[in-house]
Amino acid sequence: MNPSPRKRVALFTDGACLGNPGPGGWAALLRFHAHEKLLSGGEACTTNNRMELKAAIEGLKALKEPCEVDLYTDSHYLKKAFTEGWLEGWRKRGWRTAEGKPVKNRDLWEALLLAMAPHRVRFHFVKGHTGHPENERVDREARRQAQSQAKTPCPPRAPTLFHEEA
């Protein structure tokens, strides 16, 4: 007896940041046939890349069973990590870049891998701000979330005596 086929779900994601770092927001739109679920959140002090990753993580975590997922993003950072082998290289080098520096956002990359594990995920690039309806929708919600976080500005960065590695 064959197992039942996985449900095919579309996941549209976006992240936004007012300043980089600054207040940020993320949004994920899940679609299964006529059913939709919009998820969103924000952080007071973050980066645009962290919000892009958070959107994908939260969208995948919301799925209640293993699915075939078409993930649509306007983030080259997110898509290329998988489609151009960046992530595989980072892991082989012990979470270091080709230049030997620690990979930024490792905590979220690891969380994303865990969230992806039960699913089959295909990444699709959508050019942002070109009228793609779902991308525009998650962009608006991510920006709204970022603006709602703007009441708490990022603390100033402490001066350092050393060059930063990351």
UniProtKB/Swiss-Prot annotation:
Catalysed reactions listed for this entry: Endonucleolytic cleavage to 5'-phosphomonoester
Span list, region Disordered: 128-166
Highest taxon of the lineage: Bacteria
Gene Ontology cellular component list: cytoplasm
Gene Ontology BP terms: DNA replication, removal of RNA primer
Homology family: Belongs to the RNase H family.
Protein name: Ribonuclease H
The organism of origin for this protein: Thermus thermophilus (strain ATCC 27634 / DSM 579 / HB8)
Source taxonomy: Bacteria, Thermotogati, Deinococcota, Deinococci, Thermales
